[in-house]
Amino acid sequence: MFSAKDTLAKVDPELWQAIQAEVQRQEDHIELIASENYVSKAVMEAQGSQLTNKYAEGYPGKRYYGGCEYVDVAEQIAIDRLKKLFGAEAANVQPNSGSQANQAVLMAFAKPGDTIMGMSLAEGGHLTHGMALNMSGKWFNVVSYGLNEKEEIDYDKMEALAREHKPKIIVAGASAYALRIDWERFAKIAKEVGAIFWVDMAHYAGLIAAGFYPNPVPFADVVTSTTHKTLRGPRGGVILMKAEHEKALNSAIFPGLQGGPLEHVIAAKAVAFKEAATPEFKNYQEQVINNARVMARVLGEERGLRIVSGRTESHVFLLDLRAKNITGKDAEAALGRAHITVNKNGIPNDPQKPFVTSGIRIGSPAMTTRGFTEIEAEQIAHLVADVLEAPSDEAVAATVREKVSALCKKFPVYGA
C-alpha cells in the first residue's frame, strides 16, 4: 500500500528539484507567450486527484468499463458547463489536446485526398490547418488563404478560392492573428460552396467566453479549442458542435483517435469552465485586452517598432523586428536573459527560416493573471523595447532583470 508520507520530494528528489526550479522560473520571469497562462490551485487539485486512476473508455452512461459512476458525474459536469459557457448544442470534453480535437474534425468530415481550406501558417494560421509537414497537409489537398495588403484576412480572395476549389471543410482561426475574425462571413461562404464550417478558437476562447471577442458557435458547424491559453484551464482540448454532428465527432474521438479519456484532466477542465463563468473572469479578460493594447501602443507609437496589422483587437500581437536588424530567435534569447519570456514567430511571408524568424509574438494572458494592469503593461513594453534596442548589452539586461524582479515580487503568481 502507498503511504501518505511518500511525497514526490522523498520518492524522486531529482525530479522534485527540476519541478521546483520551474516553479521558481515562473515566479521570477514575466511570461509574454500568448499561448501560456497560469491555472488556479483548484484546477491543479482536480488534475492531481485520484481520478487519474480510473479508466473509462466511452462516454457518460455508455462505458466499456465498470466503476465509472463517479467519473460519469465529473465528465457530465464538464460537458454541461462547456455547452452553457459558449451556447453550444453539444460538446465533447475528451480530446487530449487541441490538435487531437482538430484531427477529429478532419476524420469526421473528410477523407484522405479531399480538399480543405485553412489560413496559411506563414500568415498566422496553425500547423493543424494544412501545414505540409502536419497530418492535415499530408492527407488532404490544402488550399490556403491569407492576408491582404493591410495584413487583415483577405475575405474576398478567400471567397474566390472557395468558389474555385469547393473544399469539403473551411477552417477559420489562427495562432498569430491579432484582429477580430468575421465568423459570419466565413459561414456564408462555406454554405455557398457546400463546405463544413469549422472554427478553431483556441487562442480566443477565454475572450469569447467573457464576451470580448465574437462567438463563432452560432455560425459554425463545429468549433474546436484548447482549454489552456486565454481560457486558463489545464492543457487539453474540446469540441463544440451542432447536435446533428455529435455522433460523428464523438466517434472520431473515441474510438477513432483515442482510447480511455484523461478523467483527471476532464475534471480540471470542469473547474476552469466554472471559473470562466464568473464576473471575476470577465474582468480578467477585459484587462487582458487592455494590457495587450497598451503594450502594442507603447511598442509601436512610442518605441518605433512595427506592429503586424498595425494594432491588436485581442490578447496577442506580432512585432516585426527587421528594422532593428535582429531575428526573432536572437530577440527571444535576449529577452530571456532579461527574464522576459516570449517566442520567436514568423511574420507574414517571413523571409527567415521557421526556427529563426523575423518577429516575436507577444501576449498578455499570463501577465494579466498575475494582476498586472495598464500601468505595469506600459512598464513591461518599455523593458521589452530597451532589450531589443541593445540585445547584446549585458548591462541593459541586468537593469531590466532587476526591474522584472521587482514587478514579479510585487505580483506573485500564487499569493498567500
UniProtKB/Swiss-Prot annotation:
(6S)-5,6,7,8-tetrahydrofolate binds at L121, G125, H126, L127. Keywords: Amino-acid biosynthesis, Cytoplasm, One-carbon metabolism, Pyridoxal phosphate, Transferase. GO terms for biological process: glycine biosynthetic process from serine; tetrahydrofolate interconversion. It catalyses: (6R)-5,10-methylene-5,6,7,8-tetrahydrofolate + glycine + H2O = (6S)-5,6,7,8-tetrahydrofolate + L-serine. It is an enzyme of class 2 (transferase). Its EC number is 2.1.2.1. It comes from the Bacteria. Disulfide bonds: none annotated. InterPro entries: PyrdxlP-dep_Trfase, PyrdxlP-dep_Trfase_major, PyrdxlP-dep_Trfase_small, Ser_HO-MeTrfase, Ser_HO-MeTrfase-like, Ser_HO-MeTrfase_PLP_BS, SHMT-like_dom. The modification N6-(pyridoxal phosphate)lysine is found at K229. Pathway: One-carbon metabolism; tetrahydrofolate interconversion; Amino-acid biosynthesis; glycine biosynthesis; glycine from L-serine: step 1/1. GO terms for cellular component: cytosol. GO terms for molecular function: glycine hydroxymethyltransferase activity; pyridoxal phosphate binding. It is found in: Cytoplasm. Homodimer. Belongs to the SHMT family. Catalyzes the reversible interconversion of serine and glycine with tetrahydrofolate (THF) serving as the one-carbon carrier. This reaction serves as the major source of one-carbon groups required for the biosynthesis of purines, thymidylate, methionine, and other important biomolecules. Also exhibits THF-independent aldolase activity toward beta-hydroxyamino acids, producing glycine and aldehydes, via a retro-aldol mechanism. This is Serine hydroxymethyltransferase.
